[in-house]
Structures are given as C-alpha cells and as structure tokens.
Amino acid sequence: MLPSLHDILDQHTYKWIFFGGKGGVGKTTTSSSFSVLMAETRPNEKFLLLSTDPAHNISDAFDQKFGKAPTQVSGIPNLYAMEVDASNEMKSAVEAVQKETGSAADNDAESKSEGDMFGGLNDLITCASSFIKDGTFPGMDEMWSFINLIKLIDTNEYSTVIFDTAPTGHTLRFLELPETVNKVLEIFTRLKDNMGGMLSMVMQTMGLSQNDIFGLIDKTYPKIDVVKRISAEFRDPSLCTFVGVCIPEFLSLYETERLVQRLAVLDMDCHAIVINFVLDANAATPCSMCRSRARMQNKYIDQINELYDDFNIVLSPLRHDEVRGIANLRDYAETLIKPYRFCWSANPDPSSAK
C-alpha cells in the first residue's frame, strides 16, 4: 500500500472522513492539516471540519476562534470549521421544552422514586430526570455531535465533513450512536404507545410529565429514517473512511489495535494510519537519547507495518516547532501525501548505535 493519504484525497465520493486515536497523538493537527489540503486541492467544493472532542483544539490549531456554528477559515474561502458545545446547546433545548410545557423537574425527584418497582423503566426515567433537570446525561457530547451531523445532512451544503474526534472511547461511542439512537427512539415510541398510563404514573413520582420527556426528544432527536441513512453511509466504504492516528509507542499501538478491531465490528472502512512524532535519527546522530528513542520507535513502527501490511502507513516527523496556523498546517499536510525521507530510511538501523 502507499505510504500516504493520496488515495483518500483523490476519492471525491467521501462524505465523512474521521481522524481518531489515543489522546495526545496529534489528531487535531492531522485532521486540520488534511482539511486544508482537501479544500485547497478542490477549490470549487465546500468542506467542514467538525470537532467532536469536548476539549476542542481546532481553534488553537488554526489560531482562529471557532464556535458552535460553521465559520469560514481565514484565507481558505471553501473551508469551514465548528466546535460542538454540547452542554450549552443541550441546556438551551431543555429550557425551551420547560418553557413550552410550563414545568421543570423537581430537584428532589430522585427522593420521590419508588425504588426498583419498575425495574429498567425506573432507570430510564431517572436518566430522563437528569436530562430535564440540568440538561446533562451520559454521552451527551457524542449525542449532540451526532445531532449536529444530522443537521448537516439536511443542508447538503458540504462535499465532505472531516471529523476531529475525541480520544478513542468517546469516538467509538459516537460511531455507535446511529444504532443507539435508533434503539432509543424505538423504545420511547413503544413506551408512549403501549405504556402511556404506567409511564405517566412513574414520571409523576419523579416530578416529571410526559410532555417534558417527549417534548425534549422531539426537539433534539432526529427521525428514525435519517438515523438509518447515516448508519448506512458510515458503513459504505465509498462514502466514509476512518484514519487512525498514533505515535510509535506501546500504549498508542495498543489503542490503535483496539480501535481498528472495533471499527471492523462496526463494519466501517479503515485502511490508513498516520504515525506522528517520528524521530529523524540514525546511528550517526550525535544525540544518544535521540538514538535510543529512535531505536524504540522503529521497533513499534515495524510492528505496525507487520500488523497492518494492507494499510497505508504514513510517517510524519517530530518537528522543531508546534504546528499552529495555516502555514504550518500546510507544511505538515505535505507529509500526508508525499512520504518524508527519514535519515534512517537510507541507513535504517539506529539500533546499531549504543
């Protein structure tokens, strides 16, 4: 396979491109640089870089402030970026429902619970109570990112959406959301249709009304048919691909393997891995620590090449300066499509140095 992302750049059918991996491996730099590359290579199309990481970094990468609405990247008229603010947006939705229904969850709702008499339904309503009361629930960041994605589909404004994802665990939850949302919608629909009386009684014991929960669902959750469409597109290798990002160290390699295996279970395409922070050092390098680190890195690079022999493996060198601003992002992007020639590629045995 080619040691570059050129095939992804050249395939114009991609609607969704994800960059993900362990925290601190350069996902934001890689996704931001690739979005610049795509936009400047295809100036007649519009692209969006969407951060789904609660700890957003794309504003820092571009040295430009981005928010919850798509904002044009300075100097690149066909590239937009946005950072999903899940907490504030979800609370706004909650407040809108409370205003419409004229109610709000009782802060002491949990004390009114009748214990476990309703089993799993009680747990579901407890979660909904938190949802209504303060606009938070487990997985909220991933959920709101997914809801924003649904909105983007409806506009059909961008040729490709590039995702700067959160660390692996968050990302996997996000990728599983189409199926999860579909199940949640079906559960609530069945509850509403078949258990209206019991549901109303349980919610009353918790200081809630059906209007609270179902009103909020109507405002936030997408329609089932759109969710199914997203699920199908994520699994279509002509429309969606995932680029793993890692560094040549054990923990990052382990996390990458976990990610690739899970993507296979989700039936999502992943055929490229970018390895960042690779030392350009060999046996002739005067720095003993550099030689030692290069020896360690090369061991893991060899393992990655062996594990993923049918993947595009891209090596990006450790840089003297941080990658920040358009000029530096462009410079970094070059290593994604033009293989960098490391000094050890001519003399590939830094381990010979003691």
UniProtKB/Swiss-Prot annotation:
Keywords: ATP-binding, Cytoplasm, Endoplasmic reticulum, Hydrolase, Metal-binding, Nucleotide-binding, Transport, Zinc. Pfam families: ArsA_ATPase. One of its GO terms (molecular function) is ATP binding. GO terms for biological process: protein insertion into ER membrane. ATP binds at residues 22-29, 249, 276. Its main location: cytoplasm. The active site is at 53. InterPro entries: Anion-transp_ATPase-like_dom, ATPase_ArsA/GET3, ATPase_ArsA/GET3_euk, P-loop_NTPase. GO terms for cellular component: endoplasmic reticulum. CDD domains: ArsA. Zn(2+) binds at residues 287, 290. It is an enzyme of class 3 (hydrolase). It is found in: Cytoplasm; Endoplasmic reticulum. The keyword Nucleotide-binding applies. Its EC number is 3.6.-.-. PANTHER family: ARSENICAL PUMP-DRIVING ATPASE ARSENITE-TRANSLOCATING ATPASE (PTHR10803), ATPASE GET3 (PTHR10803:SF3). Homodimer. Belongs to the arsA ATPase family. NCBIfam families: GET3_arsA_TRC40. ATPase required for the post-translational delivery of tail-anchored (TA) proteins to the endoplasmic reticulum. Recognizes and selectively binds the transmembrane domain of TA proteins in the cytosol. This complex then targets to the endoplasmic reticulum by membrane-bound receptors, where the tail-anchored protein is released for insertion. This process is regulated by ATP binding and hydrolysis. ATP binding drives the homodimer towards the closed dimer state, facilitating recognition of newly synthesized TA membrane proteins. ATP hydrolysis is required for insertion. This is ATPase ASNA1 homolog. It comes from Giardia intestinalis (strain ATCC 50803 / WB clone C6).
